[in-house]
Amino acid sequence: MGSGIETMVEKLVVPTVKVACGFKVEDNELIALVGFAMAPTSREVLTKVSFWLFKINGSVLKCGICDRGPLTRKGLFLHLTRVHREEVKALVRDELTRELKKVAHAGKADLL
C-alpha cells in the first residue's frame, strides 16, 4: 500500500480503539486527523473495526482479540493500544482499503 494510506492507518488506531471502548470521538477530532474529505469514510472504518475489538459477556468487558478480561473501559483501551496495536492497524488497513475501493468504484459508475 502507499505511504499515504499507512499514515492514515496509524492516525486511525487510537480513535478506533476509543470507539471500541465506548469513548466518544468527535467529528472535529477526526477531521483534524484525516481531513474533511476523508472524515466520513474514516468514521465508517472506525465503526466497523471497533465492533471486532471487544466482547461483552453480561456486564464483563473483554478483549475481542485475545479474550482477556474482565477489563474496565480504560483498561481495555490501554490493553488494545499497547498489546494489540499491530493487529488493530491491520484491521484498520484492510477495512480502509475496502472502503476506498467502494468509493473508487462508485466514482467510476458516476462517470459512465
Feature names for model-found ranges:
Residues M1-F51, L96-E99, A106-K108:
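Intrinsically disordered, low-complexity linkers and flanking regions associated
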